[in-house]
């Protein structure tokens, strides 16, 4: 496998040039923010179009998403567009795309994608979706309905701290509601992952007394927006952006724990979060310091370590970045510092990730996920190809 990174800036364009096909199976990952695309439009440039044209009429999988910041890991954050190109010798690539408009629900969209990707040698699915309008838990459930044993690595696209609109990209055009997936096939593929959080409880456990899907109507019999306003105080004027610094830990009816981040507040005081919260679940708010988050970034990187050449994908979140402030670059450095020097990488702050924890795929919000990939020249044993996750 050959991995290459490229960047596009409003001043200077592509450095190095847009990666082009060479006949091998490939995956092209591209991350950027809305401001970058706006700047490109103002000067008559079309960097996403450049990529699309370069890889048109090939079988490559092109996956793009908007962010709350992006970097290659060896330069400044928010450089523009960041591209990580993976070229394979024996690994196969399959692609599929849909939208909520076409499918009706996120779960149906997940099923539709999975049906398009299904193959006997499918080893992992990469998927990107709107981080505002898509229920990540439902999308993961739909994928699992068809592909219960296939790990999924997913991105919920971001929009900085604005929470207004996001985009995804399949090589054709950037769209608000497209859900795009790539399947990687073949026994030569090796994937390691590390997922860690670093948040600590603040306040007591509380009971979800009314909810439906990813909408929480009542906690302890009261609208949950009031709870966030109490904890945020003067910061409640921008409740969604600042509420991302107070993720909700959810202990569901099966005693599984997950993190959910605030996405929207409705006029009746109910809240929309990044994934499902069951009625009857026990929840509590969490907070963290920059030091906490940096320590767990290093732990995630160590869990994803592999001793052979690989590419790395680092997925953090807008809430973590808001806590870290000017130290956001340090989070990526901490994660990549645990990997072999010079590992080609793409790092992005998003609205959450879909991660397979060994039992199921679900939203891991306000966590950092580090994924390393390589193509082996010999078939791995089961223990060599397993995923690694740290809590």
Where are the language model's segments positioned?
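Small-residue-enriched flexible segments
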Residues: 1-338, 343, 348-391
């Amino acid at each position: 496998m050959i991995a290459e990174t490229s960047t596009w800036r409003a001043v200077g364009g592509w450095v190095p040039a847009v990666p082009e096909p060479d006949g091998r199976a490939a995956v092209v990952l591209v991350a950027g923010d809305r401001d970058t695309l706006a700047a490109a439009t103002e000067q008559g440039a079309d960097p996403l179009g450049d990529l699309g044209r370069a890889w048109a009429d090939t079988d490559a999988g092109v996956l793009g998403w908007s962010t709350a910041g992006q970097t290659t890991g060896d330069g400044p954050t928010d450089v523009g567009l960041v591209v990580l190109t993976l070229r394979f010798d024996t690994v196969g690539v399959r692609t599929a795309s849909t939208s909520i408009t076409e499918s009706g629900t996120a779960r149906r969209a997940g099923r539709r994608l999975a049906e398009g990707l299904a193959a006997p040698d499918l080893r992992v699915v990469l998927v990107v979706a709107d981080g505002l309008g898509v229920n990540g838990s439902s999308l993961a459930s739909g994928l699992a309905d068809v592909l219960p044993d296939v790990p999924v690595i997913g991105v919920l696209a971001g929009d900085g701290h604005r929470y207004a609109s996001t985009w995804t990209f399949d090589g054709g055009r950037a769209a608000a509601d497209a859900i795009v997936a790539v399947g990687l096939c073949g026994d030569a593929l090796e994937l390691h992952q590390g997922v860690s959080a670093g948040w600590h409880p603040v306040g007591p456990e509380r009971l979800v007394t009314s909810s439906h899907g990813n909408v929480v109507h009542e906690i302890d019999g009261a609208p949950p927006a009031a709870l966030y306003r109490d904890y945020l105080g003067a910061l409640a004027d921008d409740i969604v952006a600042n509420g991302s610094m107070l993720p909700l830990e959810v202990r569901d009816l099966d005693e599984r724990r997950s993190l959910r981040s605030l996405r929207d507040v409705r006029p009746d005081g109910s809240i929309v979060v990044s994934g499902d919260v069951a009625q009857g679940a026990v929840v509590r708010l969490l907070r963290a310091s920059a030091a906490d988050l940096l320590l767990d970034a290093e732990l995630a990187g160590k869990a994803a370590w592999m001793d052979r050449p690989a590419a790395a994908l680092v997925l953090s979140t807008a809430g973590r970045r808001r806590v870290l402030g000017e130290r956001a670059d340090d989070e990526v450095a901490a994660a990549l510092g645990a990997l072999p020097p010079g590992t080609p990488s793409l790092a992005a702050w998003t609205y959450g990730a879909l991660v397979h924890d060994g039992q199921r795929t679900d939203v891991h919000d306000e966590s950092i996920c580090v994924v390393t990939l390589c193509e082996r020249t010999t078939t791995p044993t089961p223990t060599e190809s397993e995923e690694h996750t740290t809590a």
